[in-house]
Amino acid sequence: MPGRHITDNVVVAFETMHTIGKRKKGKEGLMAIKLDMSKAYGQVELGYLEVVIRKLGLCERWISLVMMCVTTVSYEVLINGEPRGKITPSKGLRQGDPISSYLFLLCAEGLSALIKKKEAVGLIRGVGVSKFAPPVSHLFFVDDSIIFCRATMEECKQVAEVLDTYGKELGQKINRDKTSLFFSKNTRTDIQNGVKDLKGNVGTFRNSGVYDPSKINSNLKDN
C-alpha cells in the first residue's frame, strides 16, 4: 500500500515494548500479551470466515470464489502405498496456500473489532509511547498477535473476555504454555501473579521472532 512499509508494525511493537520496559513509576503498570494460538490455521471455522468477509462489504462474486476454494478442499490418505478414499475437512485453512495468510488476517478483524469496542467505553486502554501519542492496544502479524493494556485485574479480565468470545466464534484456542506476558517494572507482584493465572507464563519477547530488536534493526537496514 502507498505510504505503508512492511516493517511499520514491527517498529510500533518495538517502541511500545520499549515504553513498557522503561516505565518504573506510577500507580498503574503497563503490560503486553503475546498470544500463541494452537493450530491457528487448522482451527478456523469457515462459517465465521464467510460472516467476516460479508461484514467487510466485499463483493458477492469474490466471496463466492473464496468460499469455493476453502470448502472444496479434500485429502487422500495412502495406506501401504495405496489411496484409501478422501477426507473432507469441516474447518481450517491450508497453511502455505498463498491466500491463507490474507484470509487469516480478515478473520483477525473480528478480534480487532472486539478490542475496539471495549476501548470505546474505556474498559481496555492501550499504551502510548508519549503523552500525546495515540494509545496502541493491539498489533497483528498474520497469525501472531500482541495486545497492550494497563496491568490491572479489571483490564486483564476484559481482555480474557474478548479472547474467549473470539476463540468460540473462530474456533481458536490459546496455547497457555506459549503465551507470554511482559510487565512494566512498577507492576505489583500480586497483579502479576493474578494476571499470570488468567493468561500464561511471565516472560519477555526478546527472543520471540519479530520482536527481537536486532532483527528489527536488520530489517530496517535491508529495506
Sequence positions of predicted segments:
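Nucleotidyl polymerases of mobile genetic elements and RNA viruses
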Residues: 1-223
